[in-house]
Each structure stands twice: as structure tokens, then as C-alpha cells.
Design a protein with these regions (language model features):
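N-terminal accessory segment at the very beginning of proteins
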Residues: 19-202, 208-211, 218, 225-227, ...
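Conserved, charge-rich beta-strand/loop surface module that forms ligand/interface-binding patches
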Residues: 383, 417, 426, 711-746
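Solvent-exposed beta-strand/loop surfaces of large extracellular or lumenal domains
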Residues: 56-71, 580-600, 708-731
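Catalytic-domain carbohydrate-binding cleft regions of carbohydrate-active enzymes
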Residues: 91, 104-602, 608
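Sec-dependent N-terminal signal peptides
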Residues: 4-14
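Accessory carbohydrate-binding/adhesion or oligomerization-edge regions at the termini
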Residues: 585, 593-635
């Protein structure tokens, strides 16, 4: 050996250090740490003096998920090289005293049946896209952010610059000693595993308040109390459902004289009720509630509480500040924000306001929280969501998308989009791809925020909105633009009424699908490749998506022709299933691609055969009407089948679901030869307000000829519903704890 003393010095200086084979999880190799979170997700850290980070961040919110020692193996290869294997990965690491990189680290995984090599060099070539922060001022397609899902089978999130969360508040991290913090999602072809991994490290998407997924009315207009109530009357008189009424800026005063302002006015921010338009806000909200509708208040908080506000003196006193010197809005100051919520929000909430529309557009003023690296939008979304939980309710976010981790604050508001066909087509594509990053629930401006009136476009946009997280209309302060669905012309009104009624009837399915998203992190609106990624055709049509497990949609986003305004859309029907047109009951076998033409009143929407689609009779309050009659729509399978769909129910508002307080009911479809059996199994679980009994209505479109029908062993005679054009079996009100079995003999 030529230079034993030099080698000895290297060891003394820490330039290289041999370590014993690590055990446990995380795996520590001197200043390197590798944490196995799931079989397909791991974390790479490098920190001088081993000062690793265990506090949560906005993205890495859940530090409790670790792969058990029984589910991975560490083998020493010699020469400070180690092999770590999980059920999905083989990791090879050479401990050389440097951060994890291209030469000392690699992971091997399977993609399309072949072994591939992963390194942590973040070159994203084949990413399948994700959300955008906002569609403000957007007129057509724009580049989307990355999502987790990639045809390369991996994605890396670098969390090194993120602030920590300590005792519920932001805390800067030591970026000098902690120099590497990467989360490596290496999932191959298993897209659902990648989404589940997001939930493992970042927390699962919470259950939303049920009414969030109902029907909304929103408009930038200065309505009076009487006009707000007349809007609710109009929905009832014109036979449209309604769940949520949004009070845009006109609820507060416009008399600010100081402040940063926005878009030509200093009055975007405000917290004092405008008593000239709304003399008794508490009474107004109480009356809206009495009619079964919730209230949301618009909020642009960037100018904080200023001298013209009626709560200014009390706010400044609580802050211990001189009223002669107004305070800037300060997201990074815990005392400021707690005092702000107390004085700006609590009075309106105590009047009955249900949640806030956080209309933050001020990243150009405050891109980051003062004193921290977190973006203002990230942190304000977190704080507002927490505040809406203060009365024991589920949080209710309603804000723009803030990036990784913001899925914990649903629902997202997509911004002030232009009303045109290109924008509609992009929203269809964007909504499906957004779930790739956990942005599961968009509340779009259905019909577009600004632009020339176009009733046909509004109808087609409504059809898309009926198959998204929220059917929420909105428009700017323009007398020509009002998205109330009965003012667009007789034919357009009838077409939209059909969609609004469908939305109401589908609520049991929608809410059950929301629970599925909470449980699995699989999106509500999801691209075809999430379920059918091995088929190349699943990647080809970005205008087609699954809505939950049973519905397939391809909304029309182009103007029609002729008297019927007929337009078409390309639809791929996945192999292995049979699909039925929701409106005409026409059958389409899987494995084919068709161009479907539809008049204005319909769009391409299909139901998977061989499953039970849970619905409810039409109700003007879709999200709050008790489910006393469960509608079971069943289309036949192509052959023998045995499939179970789970209906989910809870109180729709509280956080009791977190403690397992909810109910599920299995809905089983079984076909054996010429006998089809639909079984409603006994409800499992209970919750506050649960109905102990319900009736059932079995709808059998496309059933063909059958000899007889039995309900719990007794022969019954189905009725024929002329509007649905199908046989219907009625089952009287029954104890939900008792099984109901309906047999159809072909």
C-alpha cells in the first residue's frame, strides 16, 4: 500500500466512512438516509452531521407511513455497496459519503414486463400532465404542470426547499446542513399505486361536505337580500335544483380609501356587511338555510382589516397595535392571522355563513409568505381550511390550486376562464389530468366567466359540469351574462334542465365515488389510462374520462350543425366490458372506437354493464334530501358476471367519518345463464341522521325479454316507465338492515 497515511486522513476528515449494515427503517448510512415508505415510494436525504428532518412539510404531511421491516430486505454486497429490495423494487446503493446521485445509486423496476433503471436525475420526458394554478385570463389550452403519472413509470418530488411545519406553523429549515430531500415514486405500470403513495406521504384527500358536490349559483353582481331570495325562488319555479348560493363581493362595503387594491379598486377586500343592500345579513342567511340552501362568502383578503371596517378598532386592540398605523396582511405572523380570523370571519360565520370562497389572486404582490419559502397560496389555503373546521365540521376549501399537498384542502376553484369552445375542451382535458397530482375536485366557472353569450356553448358546458366535482355556474359583472339556466332560450333551458335533473339523480353515486377517492386516492374524474394503462388507446383521447367506476363520459366541446345542433365526439369503449348509452340505452361492446353524434339535449355518456348504478329520485336539494328511495339502475352484462358496488353514506358534514362513523351498503349484480340477481345487502354501520328504512326502485333498461321477476322469493309484475323506456320494479319501504333480493328470469 503506497499511501496509508493519506487514506487514514480521509477517514479522519469524514470524506468517506464505512458503516455497518444498517437495519430498521429509515436506513441510515452516515450522512445519507433512505426511507422506505411503501414498496414503490422512498425518500432520499443527505444531511451533514446526520441532521435529518422528521418534521412534516406542506407536501410531506404524514411522516407515519413506513414500510415494515418484514416487507423489505437489505443485503451487503461488499465494498460499501448494498442491495435493498421490496416487492416492487431492487435498489443498489454504494455508500461513498456523497449525496445520492447517478453514480452511487440506482433502482430497478418493471415497466411493460421489462426491467428498467431509475436514477434520481429529474428529467421528465413522458409525464402525463397535471393541474394548473388558475385559468384566470386564459382563453384556450395552456401547458399543464406535471403530475405523478408518467409513461416512464416514475416521478420525483424535490422537497428540499420546503418550510417545515412545527407546532402547526411554518418553520424555516436548515438548508445549509440538509442538502437533499427527494421523494421517489417508482411504480412502473401501476398508476393507482402511485396515487396511493401520494396519500401515504402527503395525507389522503379528506371527505368533503356533501353539498360541495351539489348545484351552485354564483355571479359577480351586487344583489340585494330580496334578489338573493328571488334567485332561489327562480330555481324552484323553473324546476332546477340548487344546493349552494354564493355571495360575491357585493355582500361587503366598497368604501375603502387606502390599501394595495387590485384591478382598479381598493375595495376587493372587505368584511363589513353592506347594509344598504343587505340590511339584516343574519336574517337573510337564516332564510336561505330555511329553504335548504347553503351560503358561501367571497373573500379577497390581501389588504387585511383596514380603518374603514367596523371591526378595525377591536382588531387593532387585540393586536396591541396603534390604530393610526394600519397593519399589512401578514400570513407568516401567527398572532396576526389568528386575530384576523377572529374579527374578519367569526362574526359572519356565527350569523350562519357556511364557508368562504378564498379568491386569492395576489401572488404578484405576495408570492411567498414573508420570512418563509412557502407560497402565499399554499399557506393561506391551509389556514382557511383549518378555520372552517373550528365548529367540528369538515374543512371546506374553495380556492385556487397551490401545488403538491393542496389536495388536503378541497375543493379547488379554477379561476376566471374565457367562454369559448377551446376553453371548454381544455377544461375537459385538464380536469381528468389534474387528478394525477391529487387535484381531484375542480369547481369550474361553468359557461365561462367572461365572453359573449352563447347558449349552445353554455348547454355543452353544463353537460360537462354535470359530470364533474361541482355543477357551479359563475360569470363576471356583465348585464349580458347570467348563468341561471332558464334564461337562455326554451330549447336550451330544457336541455340544461335534463342535465341538472341527472346531476340530482346521480348524487348517491357521486358521493360514493367521492368516498372511493378518499379511500384510494383514485380520482373522481380520471383519464382512461389509470384503469386501462396497458392499452395504447387509453392515451389517445384526452376528451374522454371515467367518472367514478361505472360511468364513462366524452363531453362535446365543439359547435353543432343543423336544427338539432348535432355535434360529435370520439369515444373508445375499453375491452372487457359492455357499455350502454345513458340516454338511449344503446349497447356498445368493448374494444371498439366510435364517433358518436349527439343533438343538443344529449352527450356521449355510458354506463358499464353488469353493475348496479345507485341513484335517487329527482329532488330540488340533491345534497341534503334524505335517501328514502334508492334507485338501482342496472344494464345487463355481456355474459355471466358477479360484481359488487358499495354505496357510501354519512351525515355529509361532520368529521365523524374519520372515526369510522358511516354506513356502507353492498349492491351486488350477478348473472348466471338466463338468471340475473340484484341483491341489496344489509346496511353496515350507522351515522347521525341515518334513515332506518328505504324503498327501492330497480330500473332495467336494455333488459330485453324476461319471463318473470321475484322480489325476496315472491313473484311481482314490473311496471313500464314510458319516460325511461324500460321496466321498473318497485320495492316498498324496507328496513335497511334486511337484505333485498330481486331475481330476473330471462
Amino acid at each position: 500500500m503506497k499511501h496509508p497515511f493519506l487514506i487514514f486522513l480521509l477517514f479522519l476528515c469524514g470524506g468517506f466512512s464505512a458503516v455497518a449494515q444498517p437495519s430498521g427503517n429509515p436506513l441510515v448510512f452516515g450522512e445519507n438516509r433512505l426511507t422506505l415508505i411503501t414498496p414503490t415510494l422512498f425518500r432520499l436525504e443527505f444531511a451533514h452531521d446526520g441532521k435529518f428532518i422528521d418534521d412534516p412539510t406542506y407536501f410531506a404531511y404524514d411522516r407515519g407511513s413506513l414500510l415494515p421491516a418484514s416487507e423489505f430486505r437489505v443485503r451487503e454486497l461488499g465494498g460499501n455497496r448494498y442491495e435493498i429490495t421490496t416487492s416492487a423494487l431492487r435498489i443498489v446503493y454504494e455508500h461513498d459519503g456523497f449525496p445520492f446521485g447517478l453514480l452511487n445509486f440506482a433502482a430497478y423496476y418493471k415497466l411493460n414486463g421489462k426491467e428498467k433503471k431509475f436514477t434520481n436525475r429529474c428529467i421528465f420526458r413522458n409525464n402525463l400532465g397535471g393541474p394548473v394554478e388558475t385559468l384566470d385570463r386564459v382563453t384556450g389550452e395552456i401547458p399543464m404542470q406535471n403530475g405523478l403519472l408518467s409513461r416512464d413509470g416514475w416521478y420525483v418530488i424535490d422537497d428540499e426547499r420546503s418550510d417545515l411545519l412545527v407546532d402547526g406553523w411554518l418553520c424555516p429549515r436548515d438548508t445549509k446542513s440538509h442538502v437533499q430531500d427527494q421523494y421517489c415514486f417508482v411504480y412502473g405500470n401501476d398508476y393507482k399505486a402511485a396515487l396511493a403513495d401520494l396519500g401515504a406521504i402527503s395525507g389522503r384527500v379528506p371527505m368533503t361536505r356533501k353539498y360541495i358536490h351539489g348545484v351552485w349559483y354564483c355571479r359577480y353582481w351586487d344583489y340585494t337580500s330580496e334578489e338573493f331570495l328571488s334567485i332561489i325562488d327562480g330555481y324552484e319555479e323553473n324546476d332546477f335544483p340548487l344546493d349552494n348560493l354564493v355571495f360575491d363581493m357585493g355582500w361587503h362595503t366598497y368604501d375603502a380609501r387606502i390599501g394595495t387594491g387590485h384591478a382598479g379598486s381598493r375595495s376587493w377586500t372587505g368584511y363589513t356587511w353592506e347594509r344598504k343592500r343587505i340590511p339584516d345579513p343574519g336574517a337573510l342567511i337564516a332564510e336561505v338555510h330555511r329553504r335548504g340552501v347553503t351560503v358561501s362568502l367571497n373573500d379577497h383578503p390581501h389588504d387585511g382589516i383596514r380603518p374603514h371596517e367596523e371591526m378595525y378598532a377591536a382588531f387593532m386592540a387585540d393586536m396591541g397595535a396603534d390604530p393610526a398605523h394600519p397593519l399589512l396582511f401578514d400570513l407568516g405572523d401567527r398572532k396576526y392571522m389568528e386575530t384576523f380570523f377572529k374579527h374578519a370571519h367569526h362574526a359572519s360565520e356565527d350569523m350562519g355563513a357556511d364557508f368562504w370562497w378564498l379568491d386569492w389572486q395576489q401572488n404578484y404582490l405576495y408570492p411567498e409568505v414573508r420570512g418563509y419559502r412557502s407560497t402565499s397560496l399554499q399557506w393561506i389555503n391551509e389556514l382557511y381550511y383549518r378555520q372552517t373546521e373550528r365548529k367540528g365540521l369538515r374543512g371546506a376549501g374553495y380556492s385556487r390550486w397551490a401545488g403538491w399537498g393542496d389536495h388536503r384542502h378541497p375543493i379547488q376553484f379554477s379561476g376566471d376562464a374565457q367562454a369559448n369552445w377551446e376553453m371548454l375542451a381544455f377544461e375537459v382535458k385538464l380536469t381528468a389530468a389534474s387528478g394525477n397530482a391529487g387535484c381531484y375536485y375542480w369547481a369550474h366557472d361553468i359557461g365561462g366567466f367572461r365572453g359573449d353569450p352563447n347558449p349552445e356553448l353554455t348547454v355543452r358546458w353544463t353537460q360537462f359540469g354535470a359530470l364533474s366535482a361541482a355543477l357551479r355556474v359563475h360569470s363576471t359583472k356583465d348585464a349580458r351574462l347570467d348563468r341561471r339556466p332558464w334564461i337562455s332560450g326554451e330549447r336550451e333551458t330544457a336541455a340544461m334542465r335534463r342535465m341538472y335533473h341527472m346531476r340530482s339523480e346521480l348524487m348517491p353515486y357521486i358521493y360514493s365515488s367521492v368516498w372511493q377517492t378518499h379511500s384510494t386516492m383514485v380520482p373522481l374524474n380520471r383519464p382512461m389510462y389509470i384503469d386501462y394503462g396497458s392499452d395504447e388507446r387509453a392515451y389517445e383521447n384526452e376528451q374522454e374520462f371515467l367518472f367514478g367506476d361505472i360511468l364513462l363520459a366524452a363531453p362535446i366541446a365543439s359547435p353543432g350543425e343543423g336544427a338539432d345542433k348535432t355535434a360529435s365526439q370520439k369515444v373508445w369503449f375499453p375491452t372487457g366490458d359492455v357499455w350502454y348509452d345513458y340516454f338511449t340505452h344503446e349497447r356498445f361492446d368493448g374494444g371498439q372506437e366510435c364517433r358518436i353524434a349527439k343533438p343538443l339535449e344529449e352527450f356521449p355518456l355510458y354506463v358499464r354493464g353488469g353493475w348496479v348504478l345507485p341513484m335517487q329520485p329527482y329532488t330540488p336539494r340533491p345534497a341534503s334530501t334524505p335517501l328514502t328511495t334508492l334507485v338501482l339502475r342496472v344494464y345487463p352484462s355481456a355474459g355471466d358476471a358477479d360484481n359488487t358496488y358499495t354505496l357510501y353514506e354519512d351525515d355529509g358534514l361532520s368529521r365523524d367519518y374519520e372515526r369510522g362513523i358511516h354506513a356502507t351498503t353492498e349492491l351486488n349484480y350477478r348473472r348466471a345463464g338466463d338468471v340475473t340477481t340484484v341483491t341489496v345487502r344489509p346496511a353496515a354501520g350507522s351515522y347521525r341522521g341515518q334513515e332506518p328504512r328505504r324503498a327501492y326502485q330497480l330500473q332495467l333498461p336494455a333488459a330485453g325479454e324476461f319471463r318473470r321477476v321475484k322480489v325476496n322469493g315472491r313473484t311481482v309484475k314490473p311496471a313500464f316507465d314510458g319516460q325511461l323506456r324500460c321496466p321498473v320494479v318497485e320495492v316498498p319501504s324496507t328496513d335497511i338492515r334486511k337484505e333485498v333480493k330481486i331475481e330476473i328470469f330471462g
